[in-house]
Structure formats: C-alpha cells, structure tokens
Amino acid sequence: MQQIDIFTTPIWKALLPQSVDTQWLIDLAYEKKGTNPLNNCNGWQSFDQEQEMSFAFPIPQGLKLQQFLDDCMNSIAKELGLPMVSLLNYWLNINPPGAYNNLHKHRNALLVGNLYLQVPDKNSGGIEFVRDDDADYYVPVDANYNPVIGTRHIINPEQRDILIFPGWQPHAVQTNKSDKDRVSLSFNYGAIK
C-alpha cells in the first residue's frame, strides 16, 4: 500500500564550521545580561535585536556567521519552494541550571533557528517539539513512537549544532539539569518581499 505524507514538519540540523568563531557571542550574552537582566523561566533572554539586523560585530566573525546562517535558511526555503528569506531578528539566551522555556511558536517567522553556543552536557535541556493537533487524545499511550503517530520529539543538541524549523512548530526547552549554563542564539527569518 502506498503512504502519502501530508503536512510533514521537518527539522533541519547543521553543524557550524569550526572556522566560525562563537566565543564573542557567548561574551556578548554575558555582557548584555549584566546590563539588562531580563528573566524568562529562571533563564535570561536579550531583547529582540530588531534594530541590529546584522551579526557583523566583530568583523569578520559576525559576517561569517550571518553568511552561513543566510545560506542555510535560503537553501531550506528553496527546497520548500518558498521565496528567499532574510533575518528578521535574533536574541541571545542563557539558561542556567533550573531554567527552561515554555511551549511557544514564533509568529511572523517563516523559519526559526537556534545555534547552540555552549552546551555543558545532554542534561542541559533538550528542545522538545510538540504536535499542534489532537493526536494525544487518539494515539494509545503505549504505542511505539514513529513520525506519523508521535506527538512529542526531543532533540538534545550539542555545541555548535544549528536546528532550524518552521515558525509555526510548537516547541519548548526542557529544564537545564546540568550544573553549568547553556548559551544559545535564536533567530527568525521571514520572506523577502
């Protein structure tokens, strides 16, 4: 029998090349946290960098990073038959031990990404993707997971991993159960009009 997949939701994973320095972003996160201690579920997020539409600080590291992310995002957009995309905004996240992020979506973003800058270990909080339908009510609790009937999927990222997914995909960040901070860069891309 033929299976026809509809409404599939892929998650793309890339690895940031070692040639792209990220220490300056980790330093920037802690610097911004010191001047703007916003709180989010025991963690910290910088405000959306809507006025700074480039990662080009410092050059050349920022330019290399943005070019790599732009290429990844536009490759995915092309694969999906979408128009070219560009950076809408980005923010830094510091999740110390005990921090997490509630289930949410990224409205107004076509594609969303997260670059994991500092990942102490696999206990520092995986990203959990959740179906946005009623499958939980129909699928038996003891059913084996597969992409068709699965209702939750957890990815435990490693340092320098980049995860990309559609903005409408609900997701949460699990509690950091390690003894060190996890630091990441989140970013939204939208269609070029």
Per-segment meaning from a language model:
Residues M1-L82, Y100, R182, Y189-K193:
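Non-heme Fe(II)/2-oxoglutarate
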Residues P10-W12, D181-L185:
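Short beta-strand micro-motifs in enzyme catalytic cores
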Residues N93-I164, A191:
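Catalytic core of non-heme Fe(II) oxygenases with the double-stranded beta-helix
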